[in-house]
């Protein structure tokens, strides 16, 4: 079947392959202005702990080149700017112009200048040279990508030998009771919060559905191996609600 005739998941809905990117863009154009507030409300602030653990595992040092992919409002990029110093460089990249604008304004206001660039790019075809980055992170972005295999291969291409990829993403709870409670919360509370805070319940309904459709921990681990990464491991956080996958390029 050609890509033009293929369908893919947009939450629980099947849509033509080429339409998913447009629909996801609509979601994030809608929520960009309130994205940070909603993250704090939805996760009770725990997303900050998940991101802190990701940064701690990154191995980023002074002078490194770092790509924060699907970096949105720049939580990780801000910390990486401090870690790489003026000898290094951070690229905050997102496919969504609204998210990128919010991130640029936020980081500029926090004094993050001189060693950061902002690049609107599609993860499936990254516009960077081969073997360029010491570290790549993608935080809560992979599940929104249409062709995840192609995106992972693109990340592997632009990563230096010896570099690492960190994928922080919602995953599958490993405790049955937690899974049931989490599903109830996701499908009822998230759209309700979206309606109250952003006047957009549908975008947060998609969020809940996209989490359910995202590959589980073992499947994503194998996808990273298939894309060319080695020594892939993952760490469950908050009972598997979130998982951090780390893979290396040798």
UniProtKB/Swiss-Prot annotation:
EC number: 2.1.1.163, 2.1.1.201
Catalytic activity as recorded in UniProt: a 2-demethylmenaquinol + S-adenosyl-L-methionine = a menaquinol + S-adenosyl-L-homocysteine + H(+); a 2-methoxy-6-(all-trans-polyprenyl)benzene-1,4-diol + S-adenosyl-L-methionine = a 5-methoxy-2-methyl-3-(all-trans-polyprenyl)benzene-1,4-diol + S-adenosyl-L-homocysteine + H(+)
Gene: ubiE
GO molecular function list: 2-methoxy-6-polyprenyl-1,4-benzoquinol methyltransferase activity; demethylmenaquinone methyltransferase activity
Principal EC category: transferase
Protein's recorded name: Ubiquinone/menaquinone biosynthesis C-methyltransferase UbiE
This protein's pathway: Quinol/quinone metabolism; menaquinone biosynthesis; menaquinol from 1,4-dihydroxy-2-naphthoate: step 2/2; Cofactor biosynthesis; ubiquinone biosynthesis
PROSITE patterns: SAM_MT_UBIE, UBIE_1, UBIE_2
Family from the record: Belongs to the class I-like SAM-binding methyltransferase superfamily. MenG/UbiE family.
Top-level division of the source organism's lineage: Bacteria
Pfam family, one: Ubie_methyltran
